[in-house]
Each structure stands twice: as C-alpha cells, then as structure tokens.
Amino acid sequence: MKDASWRDHCTMGCSLFFLALICGSIIGYFLYSFFNQKKLEEKKQAFDNKLKEKEKDLQKREQEMMRNAKIEIASLRQKLELDLEQRTNTIVDLESKNNRREELLNNRTESLNKREEHLDSEKQIISHTKKNLEQQIKEQETILNTQKQQLEKIASLTQDQARQIIMKETRDQTTYEMMSYIKQEEEKAKSEASKKAKTLLVLAMQKYSGDITGEKNISVVNIPNEDMKGRIIGRQGRNIKSLEVLTGVDLIIDESPCTVILSSFDPIRREIAKKTLEFLVSDGRIHPSRIEKALETSTIEVDNFIKEMGEEATFITKIGEVHPDLIKILGKLHFRISYSQNVLKHSLEVAFLAGKLASEIGENEILARRAGLFHDIGKALDHEMEGSHVEIGVSIASKYKEKKEVIDAIASHHEDQEPQSIIAALVAIADTLSSARPGARKESVENYIQRLTKLETIANSTKGVAKSYAIQAGREIRVIVEPDKIADNFIFQTARTIKEQIEKEIIYNGVIKVTVLRETRAVEMAKL
C-alpha cells in the first residue's frame, strides 16, 4: 500500500512537473514573441524613417538635377539658335551675292546673244553685197562687150587688142572696189573679235573673285605686362641678342604699351620669330637655351603650316596629284610678297582666271589652272637659288616632271620667250589681269625687298659664311660665320670683304653696318 501510494505521489509529481514545464515554456515563448515583436516594430519604424529621409534626399537631388538640366538645355538651345541665326544670315548673304552674279551673267549672256544676232545680220548683209557685186560684174561685162565693139569700130583694133585693153581697165577698177570692201569687212571683223574677247575676259573675271592681301613687314606680339619687356631683353641684353641672332629678325621694344614689334623683310622668318616669342611669353621662362628649343618647335609648326597651305591650294584648284616637295614649295608662296601682292593668292587668282578663259574657248581647263597655279613657283626659292624666278621656276617644274604646257607657261608669262601653246598664252593674259588692277602693286616695296635680299646674297656668297640676316631696314647686315673655317683673326677680313662687295654691287644712300659674329660651343653630357 505504501509503495503504491508512493508511486502515485511520484507519478502525480512528475505530471505536475511536466505540466509546469510546458506551461512555463508556453508562457516564455509568448513573452519572447511579445518582446521580439516590439523590437521588430521599433526597427521597422527606424528603417521606415531612414527610407523616408532617403526618398526626400533623392527627390531633392532629382529636382536639382532637373533644374541644372533645364538650365543647360536652355543654354544649348540659345547657342544653337544663335549659331543657326548666324548661319542663316550667312546663307542669305551668299544667296544674295549669287543672285546678283546670276543677274550679271544673264545680262552678259543677253548681250552676247544680241551680238551674235548682229553678226548674223552682218553675214546676211555681206552675202547680199556679194550678190550685188556679182550682178555689177555681169553688168560691167555687158558694158565691156558693148565698148569692145565700139572700140573695134572706132579704132580699127583687132579683137584681141581690144580685149586686153578692156580687161586691164576692168581688172583695175574691180580690184580697187574689192580691196576697199575687203578692208572694211576686215576692220569690222577685228572690231567684233576685240569686243568678243573683252566679253570673254569680263566673264572670266566675274566668275572668280579672290581676296587681296596687303603687304606687311612687321608683326606685333602682345605681352601681359611691361615687366615682360625686361625679361625679353634679359641681363645685359643677352636674351634679345640671342633672339635676333637665331631668328634673323629685328626686335623693337619701345614705349608702346604691352607690345613687342618684330621687323623683317622675310615673312617666314618673321612668322617663326613671332611664334617663338609668343611661346616664350606664355611659358614665362626666357633664356638662351629655352629660346633655342622654342625656335625649333616654332620652325616645325611653320613648316607644317606651309605644307597645309600648299595642300589647300592644290585642293581648291582641283588640279590632281602634285609631288609632295612641290606642294611644300607652293606653300612658301603664302609668305612671299611681290609688288604688294601675296604671291599664293595671286597664283590662285591666275589659276582660276586661266581656267575660265580656257573653258570659254574649249581648251583644257584643269591644265590651264595647273599652269596658272605654278607660273610664279620660282619666287618661293628665288632668295635661295641663283637666277630669275622664271629660270628657277622652269628648273623646279622640270625637276618634278610637270607637263610641257606648264613649263612653257612658266617660261613665257613675262614674255621672256614666245608661248608655244595656247595654255601658256592664257596664263600670261590671266597674270596680266591679276597684276594690272589699280593699286595691286607697289614698285618701291618690291625694290626695297630686292635690296635686302641682295645684301644677304652677297654675304652668303662669301667664303666661310654660314648664314646672314639683313636687319634695321637694310642699314645693317648681320653675318654668322662657321667657326671651324674662319678663325677669330680673320673675321675682320671677312667683314671688310663683304663691305667692299656691297659697295661694288649695291647703290644706296647712307651707311650699311656689317657685323660678323663667330661663336664656338663646347657641349658635354654628364651621366648620373
């Protein structure tokens, strides 16, 4: 009994224990779920708050980006509208010019048509006159027959004798009348031919209108402040001396505010010096070694520009393939001035005029343009080679195997020889048209440049001279000798030789200063 009661108590205790354990687990689970749910809600609330802040921030950024985009779009639209307006104005101007030219051409065409009608009427008149003459001849023959019979009766002449007398008188009278008529018709024909030739020239000139570039012997370089002038001059003038010696250009630094003037009769030299000085001013470092580097860079840049100008000229004229070296020589004409005309512009003008004249008379237009473009090619190298620009041009064209019509045009455009082709004659006419415009040329400037070129030629022909530059408007010639050929003791003799040669060959007023420079450099490279 006791054992059974004890087992019952134990069973009941275990049941209560497990029941209490289950109840505690359930209560603990609900408590855990309650507190965990509260934490999750707090975290969710915090996350929602952060999400709202992010959304607000994104909205602000989106609004700001929209504002910036609208501003940028408005700016671009304004620029595009302005550009469109400018282009529209340009197109309107071009259309207006084209309309005016078309009106002029139409007027000229009508005039030519009228002249053709006039010529046709003249031909009809001539034909009618010819018929009248034939009728008159027949009448004269009838009269002669009558006279012949009368003469035979009166003078008792034989028929052959009378025939000879009558024929001689008739021949003399008819010949006189015919010669008078032929002379009148020849004068009319010459007059009509002259008018038609002038009309062709006017039409050719109207179809091409080129820009005219005036001559300029100085270039101006702007500098940021007056202190830069002192840096350009350098200590004891070493920088400006180095610039003048290396470039061969005269630097003029006066009281003009924030400007430096470059003076030289050689435009290529002056352009290289200008770019060199602009590079040095922008860089800020000005000393002899830096000047040499800047000069090298500027020389390459100008060489590339010369090539571009030559390529542009051949492209504009559409003359086909040209030798690369000949293109470079052609580009140099951009910097060559002759009688106040830019020679490259002049050559382009001659090319187009010659081409138009050729097309009007049925000749090869492309070949005429090519001959016109190269007719003054010798002027690109006339300061480097001996001979006239015509002789040099013929030599260059022959070297690069140009066609015989082109060589003939170069050789005959100054009437040094008779033109052997129609193309050469057309180029000579076009050259005269381009050169003969009022104010197109100035003799005095050309003579001045020729005198400076002659000074340099005399100096360069002296033994041991490396290069020379005429500066100070031809009042000084600066000569640089080769140090390995001319010793210090002989530079005075070189200066005296050049001076005597100048006195023999050049007529001038005043004094020309001859300065001979000899410089020796020693360079070693230190390796670290």
UniProtKB/Swiss-Prot annotation:
Biological role stated in the UniProt entry? Endoribonuclease that initiates mRNA decay.
User: What family does this belong to?
Assistant: Belongs to the RNase Y family.
Q: Which GO terms describe its cellular component?
A: plasma membrane
Instruction: Please state every residue range assigned to the domain named HD.
Output: 343-436
Q: Which gene encodes it?
A: rny
What is the annotated signal peptide range for this record?
Answer: none
Domain KH, chain residue ranges per copy: 217-277
Q: Which organism is it from?
A: Aster yellows witches'-broom phytoplasma (strain AYWB)
UniProt-listed InterPro entries: HD/PDEase_dom, HD_domain, HDIG_dom, KH_dom, KH_dom_type_1, KH_dom_type_1_sf, Ribonuclease_Y, RNase_Y_N
Q: Where are the transmembrane segments?
A: 15-35
One annotated GO biological process: mRNA catabolic process
Q: How does it sit in the membrane?
A: Single-pass membrane protein
- What CDD domains does the record point to? HDc, KH-I_RNaseY
Q: Where in or outside the cell is it found?
A: Cell membrane
- Name the UniProt record assigns to this protein: Ribonuclease Y
Q: Which GO terms describe its molecular function?
A: RNA binding; RNA endonuclease activity
